């Protein structure tokens, strides 16, 4: 069984529409948006684990690189997974306030590019929408592989720069160029974007991600995170994939 076989059954058009419809609530109702994304991600990771290991990920240890304020912690804890979260920004770690229970995992303040964990120390290492926010995304990926036990899973998902969501809060102006989009945003709002091009937002392509994954010798699968199964073949079409694969998932297994 391929690692994506179980998840592929759930990757329907209805799921895609449901997830994408939540994006409009990212700023106005973050609990609604991130709660839905976290629940879907926990289910996706469990599907990937189940396909490769024949059992649920419940009871396994998962390290979430860039876990944020705790919505993912709650979703994985509810699924029976032992959750460890890494977040470099203390503001993000506490942003959820009282919505996250005290017993939903362990959190560490650290950089994803220098994880403070031993080699082969977790069963699953996840990074969701973080790689585009660090200057060296494949160093982050290498760290994820380092801490994942042989036979475990590293799941690296990131927003593709040339996709429709690549500019984050800058909207589609990123197609004018990152620096110009950042200038336009600052001029309009009177302050830089939270995801500011060149400091907290960087260009990451599908091609670069696929090339890096292939170079590790650990790649199992690559697919568009929010697309229905019948659209996954877009990942293999050069140029077009950069615009139509809005978020790429790389699944790797250290040996």
Swiss-Prot record:
EC class name: transferase
UniProt-listed GO biological process terms: methylation
Any one Gene Ontology molecular-function term assigned to this protein's record: S-adenosylmethionine-dependent methyltransferase activity
InterPro entries: Methyltransf_11 (IPR013216), SAM-dependent_MTases_sf (IPR029063)
Keywords associated with the record: Methyltransferase, Transferase
The protein's Enzyme Commission number: 2.1.1.-
A matching Pfam family: Methyltransf_11
UniProt similarity note: Belongs to the methyltransferase superfamily.
Record-linked PANTHER family: 2-METHOXY-6-POLYPRENYL-1,4-BENZOQUINOL METHYLASE, MITOCHONDRIAL (PTHR43591:SF24), METHYLTRANSFERASE (PTHR43591)
Protein name (database record): Uncharacterized methyltransferase MAP_3663c
Protein source organism: Mycolicibacterium paratuberculosis (strain ATCC BAA-968 / K-10) (Mycobacterium paratuberculosis)
